[in-house]
């Protein structure tokens, strides 16, 4: 063994544990046998036994009994789980109700304004509406998607899923960048964006803006981010953190938003900690997309 390196032993298989248990019981039976003949009889009985068959029968019995127990008790366990869930949701609402009301009010007012604006645009004469048709279509769908994601974030925050809410904000931020880029570079870019929806193209549609070198092999989101009107430098750190939260990164695994800033806690469910970041960022992103 190399100095300073701990060698991790391989975990024992269920079969190995089973055999060790039988051997321990056998040794005890032989030790407690009244006569040597009785001890030999016990040993012979063990040696003639089909241990693999016994193990398979044991495993089958345990599996059936476990399934039967779970089936019998699952409704009781789920009702207990739901009671705990409702207790958490009530505490969460009591603690954060002002923030939730503000977020939901923003959603309601933005939706009403968007509906009124759509009716106004669609009532315009065709010749007045046509020059910005593709920009309107692209922005309408982007805005609709952002509205849904904003509501998803509210729902996740109410349920105590800070990391999930922040992951959804990541998508909202990307929508804010794309919407800013389309508005900035105009109708032809908006049309290419729409047409790309029927292809596998992710960002090549952005070449229509003439903002990228023809020598550039692929356009990335980061490329678009650099040339849009949103101050991406101010948001880069937060966006990078959201990426780590979404992906299987060590930072996103050991630094969960809902774990109270300590490695002593492993988040496996709801937490009332860490939801403010997603709430604030999503409100800003929705305002940017709605502008």
Question: What do these predicted ranges mean?
Answer:
Residues 98, 102-112, 116, 145, ...:
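Charged, amphipathic alpha-helical oligomerization/scaffolding segments
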Residues 263-291:
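Amphipathic, Lys/Arg-enriched alpha-helical patches that create a basic surface
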């Amino acid at each position: 063994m190399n100095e300073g390196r701990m060698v991790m032993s391989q975990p024992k298989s269920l079969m190995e544990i089973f055999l060790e248990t039988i051997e321990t019981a056998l040794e005890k039976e032989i030790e407690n046998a009244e006569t040597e003949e009785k001890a030999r009889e016990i040993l012979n009985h063990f040696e003639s036994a089909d241990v693999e068959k016994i193990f398979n029968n044991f495993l089958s019995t345990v599996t059936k009994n476990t399934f039967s127990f779970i089936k019998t008790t699952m409704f009781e366990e789920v009702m207990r789980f739901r009671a705990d869930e409702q207790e958490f949701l009530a505490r969460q609402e009591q603690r954060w109700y002002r923030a939730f009301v503000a977020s939901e009010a923003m959603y309601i007012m933005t939706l009403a304004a968007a509906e009124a604006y759509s009716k106004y645009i669609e009532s315009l004469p065709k010749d007045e509406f046509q020059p910005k048709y593709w920009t309107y279509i692209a922005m309408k769908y982007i805005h609709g998607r952002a509205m849904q994601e904003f509501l998803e974030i509210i729902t996740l925050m109410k349920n105590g899923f800070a990391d999930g809410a922040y992951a959804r904000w990541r998508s909202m931020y990307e929508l804010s960048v794309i919407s800013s880029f389309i508005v900035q570079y105009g109708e032809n870019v908006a049309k290419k964006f729409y047409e790309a929806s029927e292809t596998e193209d992710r960002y090549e549609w952005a070449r229509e803006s003439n903002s990228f070198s023809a020598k550039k092999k692929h356009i990335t989101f980061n490329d678009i981010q650099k040339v849009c009107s949103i101050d991406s430098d101010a948001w880069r750190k937060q966006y990078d953190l959201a990426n780590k939260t979404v992906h299987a990164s060590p930072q996103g695994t050991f630094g969960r938003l809902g774990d109270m800033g300590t490695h002593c806690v492993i988040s496996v469910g709801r937490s009332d900690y860490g939801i403010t970041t997603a709430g604030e960022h999503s409100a800003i992103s929705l305002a940017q997309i709605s502008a």
